[in-house]
């Protein structure tokens, strides 16, 4: 394996900084959004929804409200040119409403440890695109609502 380029090293540092901004009580959505380019976006693949501008931070706030102790455990973080790939898990205790496209899941008190893969593309040290692939069926099963999602939802 060849050595990382200075751009790849910088890109990895940018992504580690991005994750640090959304950890538990230290959550700083405004600074999280500021790391994106003006034309950048966040793509929540499971919901098939792209967010632009200030809305990039919406899912950060949704998950922070539902899981106030939210922590992202990074297993693998690798850069390839202007791309950074991250394998991680989203971890936390479900203590608040979880708003999803189908409705709202009230707090269950259960622990989530959902597998996730994030794919970033950077331009000049800022995030242009962030595609987030969360294993939603596993997340819903961990909350105890997967097999009976309709009964668990508030509309």
Predicted regions and their residues:
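Short, low-complexity N-terminal intrinsically disordered segments enriched in polar/charged residues
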Residues: 1-38, 151-155
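A short acidic/glycine-rich loop-to-helix N-cap element
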Residues: 5-6, 105, 140-145
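A solvent-exposed, acidic/Ser-Thr-rich amphipathic alpha-helical stretch
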Residues: 11, 29-96
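Short, surface-exposed coil-to-beta transition loops
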Residues: 71-72, 112-117
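Short, surface-exposed loop/helix-turn segments at secondary-structure junctions
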Residues: 96-108
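A contiguous, mid-protein "functional segment" used to position or interact
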Residues: 115-135
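Low-complexity, intrinsically disordered terminal/linker segments enriched in charged
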Residues: 128-155
């Amino acid at each position: 394996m060849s050595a990382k380029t200075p751009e790849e090293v910088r890109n990895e540092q940018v992504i580690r900084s991005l994750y640090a901004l959304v950890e538990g009580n230290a959550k700083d959505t405004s600074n999280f959004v500021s790391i994106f380019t003006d034309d950048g976006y966040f793509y929540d693949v499971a919901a098939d929804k792209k967010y632009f501008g200030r809305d990039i931070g919406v899912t950060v706030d949704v998950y922070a409200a539902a899981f106030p102790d939210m922590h992202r455990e990074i297993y693998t973080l690798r850069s390839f040119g202007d791309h950074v790939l991250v394998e991680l898990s989203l971890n936390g205790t479900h203590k608040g409403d979880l708003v999803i496209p189908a409705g709202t899941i009230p707090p269950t008190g259960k622990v989530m440890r959902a597998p996730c893969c994030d794919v970033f593309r950077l331009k000049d040290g800022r995030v242009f695109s962030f595609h987030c692939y969360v294993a939603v069926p596993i997340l819903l099963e961990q909350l105890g609502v997967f097999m009976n999602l309709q009964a668990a939802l508030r509309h």
